[in-house]
Swiss-Prot record:
The gene is dcuC. Induction: Expressed only under anaerobic conditions. Anaerobic induction depends mainly on the transcriptional regulator FNR. Nitrate and fumarate cause slight repression and stimulation of expression, respectively. The expression is not subject to glucose repression. Active under anaerobic conditions. Belongs to the DcuC/DcuD transporter (TC 2.A.61) family. It is a multi-pass membrane protein. GO terms for biological process: C4-dicarboxylate transport; mixed acid fermentation. The keyword Membrane applies. This is Anaerobic C4-dicarboxylate transporter DcuC.
C-alpha cells in the first residue's frame, strides 16, 4: 500500500510540474516548488531528507533548506562554474570575432553540401567521439554548446536541431572507463575489457548509427512542420577584423581536453583548461592592438556571459536537483525497484521490465546515474536466481539510464543545453525523443542478438 502511495504522489507532482512548465511558467520556479513540496511530504512521512553522506541539522524543516544550500554550493561551485566559464568563453569568442571567422572558413567547403542535415549528422558523429574525452553528460553538452552549436546554427541548422545534437551524444555510452561502465562490468561478472570493448561497444556503435539516421529524418520533419527555413549564411555579409587563425580559438577547449587527459600531458580540470584558453585569447587580443583598456573591456563581455549563465542555467540545475532529490526521498525510485522484482524469471520479459523502469526513473529524476546505480545492485541476485546472464540485463539498463536522461526535461544536460540555446527544455526533449527511442530499440534488439540470455549459454553448459 505504501509503495502505491509513494508512486501516486510522485506521478501527481510530476504531472503538475510538467503542466505548468508547458503553460509557460518559469521552469526554475516550478521545479523548485515541486521539489520542495516532495521534500516536505517526505519529511511528514518520516523519510530522511538529506543524502546519507550529509549530516542532519536536527530538524526536518531546516534539512530541506540545507539541501538547497548543498546544491547551491556544489552545482554553483563545480558544475555551475564550468558552465559559466564555458558560456563566458563562448561570449568572448563572439566578441573578438573568432566565431565569425570559423563560419567564414567553414562555409567555403560546406557550400558544396546542399543539405544542412548532412552537416548536422557529421557534427553528431564528432560530438559522439568527444564523449570519449568528456565523461560528464552535462559537461559534454555545455562544451558542445560553446563550440559546435554556434557553428551549426550559422551554417543553416535550426537552433532546435543543433541543440538536440549537443544534448544527444552522452545518451549512448562509448567511454570504456566511465564509472557506469566499470560498475556494470562488475555486476555482469566480466572483465572491463571484455564487457566494454567486446560486448558493449558493438551495441553502442549500432545505436549511434541508428540515432544519426533518426536525427536526419526527425529534425527535417520537425523543421518542415514548424516552417523553419534553412538559409546558409552568406559569408560575404560577415565583417570581422579577426585574423584567419582565430578560427582555431573556439575549439581550444576541445583540444585542451584531449591533450590534458593525463596521457599526453598533465590531467587538468576543464575549468583550468578554460582559464588557459581565455588567457591565450586575451594575450592574442593584446598583441593585435597593444591596447590594455580594450582587452580588459572585452573580457567584461565574458564576465557578463558568465552572469547570464548563472541566471539562466545554473539556477535551473539547482532547481532540477531539488526536484530529483524530492522524488528520491519520497520513495519513488525504490517503489519502481520493488515493481521490477515482482516479475517472473523469463529473460526477455525481465530485461524489458528493467529497461522500462530504468528509463522511466531516468526521465522523471533527470539523472542517468541514480536509477542505474539503484537498479544494478539487484542484477547479480536476480540473474543468479533466474539463471540469466547478468550482462544480458545490465547492458540494456546501462544504456536505458543514459537514454532516459536525454528524454528528461529536468536532466542537467537538457536543462543546460536548453538554457544556452534559449529554448524550452521540452523543445529539446521533443527534438531528441525519436532518435532516443530508436536508439533504445536498437540496444534491445542488439542485446537479444549479440548477448547470450542465459548463464548456461555463457558457461557453455
Amino acid at each position: 500500500m505504501l509503495t502505491f502511495i509513494e508512486l501516486l504522489i510522485g506521478v501527481v507532482v510530476i504531472v503538475g510540474v510538467a503542466r505548468y512548465i508547458i503553460k509557460g511558467y518559469s521552469a526554475t520556479g516550478v521545479l523548485f516548488v515541486g521539489g520542495l513540496l516532495l521534500l516536505i511530504i517526505s519529511a511528514i512521512m518520516g523519510h530522511k531528507v538529506l543524502p546519507s553522506s550529509q549530516a542532519s541539522t536536527g530538524y526536518s524543516a531546516t534539512d530541506i533548506v540545507e539541501y538547497v544550500k548543498i546544491l547551491l554550493m556544489s552545482r554553483g561551485g563545480d558544475l555551475g562554474m564550468m558552465i559559466m566559464m564555458l558560456c563566458g568563453f563562448a561570449a568572448y569568442m563572439t566578441h573578438i570575432g573568432a566565431n565569425d571567422m570559423v563560419v567564414k572558413l567553414a562555409s567555403k567547403p560546406l557550400q558544396y553540401i546542399n543539405s544542412p542535415y548532412l552537416l548536422m549528422i557529421a557534427a553528431y558523429f564528432v560530438a559522439c567521439l568527444m564523449s570519449l574525452a568528456v565523461s560528464s553528460a552535462t559537461g559534454l553538452g555545455v562544451l558542445l554548446m560553446a563550440t559546435l552549436f554556434p557553428v551549426m546554427v550559422n551554417v543553416g541548422i535550426s537552433r532546435g536541431a543543433a541543440a538536440a545534437i549537443c544534448a544527444s551524444p552522452a545518451a549512448i555510452i562509448l567511454a570504456p572507463t566511465s564509472g557506469d561502465v566499470v560498475l556494470a562490468a562488475q555486476a555482469s561478472e566480466m572483465s572491463l575489457i571484455d564487457f566494454a570493448f567486446k560486448t558493449t561497444l558493438p551495441i553502442s556503435i549500432a545505436a549511434i548509427i541508428g540515432m544519426a539516421i533518426a536525427h536526419f529524418f526527425w529534425q527535417r520533419y520537425l523543421d518542415k512542420k514548424e516552417h523553419i527555413s534553412h538559409e546558409m549564411l552568406d559569408v560575404s555579409e560577415i565583417t570581422t577584423t579577426a585574423p584567419a587563425f582565430y578560427a582555431i580559438l573556439p575549439f581550444t577547449p576541445i583540444i585542451g581536453v584531449l591533450i590534458f587527459d593525463g596521457k599526453w600531458g598533465p590531467q587538468l580540470h576543464i575549468i583550468t583548461i578554460l582559464v588557459i584558453c581565455m588567457l591565450i585569447a586575451s594575450i592574442l587580443e593584446f598583441l593585435r592592438s597593444f591596447n590594455t583598456q580594450k582587452v580588459f573591456s572585452g573580457l567584461e563581455v565574458a564576465y557578463r556571459g558568465m552572469a547570464d549563465a548563472f541566471a539562466n542555467v545554473v539556477m535551473l540545475l539547482v532547481a532540477a536537483g531539488v526536484f530529483a532529490q524530492g522524488l528520491s526521498t519520497i520513495g519513488f525510485i525504490q517503489s519502481l525497484i520493488s515493481i521490477a522484482t515482482s516479475f517472473g524469471s523469463a529473460s526477455i520479459i525481465l530485461m524489458l521490465v528493467l529497461v522500462i523502469l530504468t528509463m522511466l526513473a531516468a526521465v522523471t529524476t533527470g539523472s542517468g546515474n541514480a536509477p542505474f546505480y539503484a537498479f544494478v545492485e539487484m542484477i547479480p541476485k536476480l540473474a543468479h536466481s533466474s539463471g540469466i546472464n547478468p550482462a544480458y540485463l545490465t547492458i540494456p539498463m546501462l544504456q536505458a539510464s543514459n537514454l532516459g536522461r536525454t528524454l528528461s526535461p529536468v536532466s542537467g544536460v537538457v536543462v543546460a543545453v536548453a538554457g544556452m540555446a534559449k529554448i524550452s527544455p521540452f523543445e529539446v526533449v521533443k527534438r531528441t525523443s525519436v532518435p532516443v527511442l530508436v536508439g533504445l530499440v536498437i540496444v534491445i534488439v542488439a542485446t537479444e542478438l549479440m548477448v547470450p540470455g542465459t548463464a548456461a549459454a555463457v558457461t557453455g553448459k
